């Protein structure tokens, strides 16, 4: 939503992986940057219909993935939880739901195929920090960094070729 743009930007720029400064400097700088960038960002969001499509699309992707996993792997129940890095739902918002589900193992899968300390690295770190803060210990692995995975490339190639044929 438009009213969430500035707090989203603040969360983004207050991340030590984005601005590697002591908190005493990073916090006011994040406030300044988010305040100055918010008007331009709000105009962009207005052009997108008033909000970012990312959460809606991520929910759809999550639901489709859970259905496919549960159809393919019938010996276990799979559930996908969405955690956003700079806006809701944050790791702190989701951990109770994960604990209630009580998985034997958690597989973290950032939607960024490439590794970057400021994106996938920061997201993984936040999840681990929240687990530690909540004294939550469960086997956790990460699917990270798959930009050259052949299946990933094939899926993108297939969609690109479809678009080219539509031109």
What is the role of each PLM region?
Residues 1-167:
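Active-site-proximal alpha-helix that buttresses catalytic centers in soluble enzyme cores
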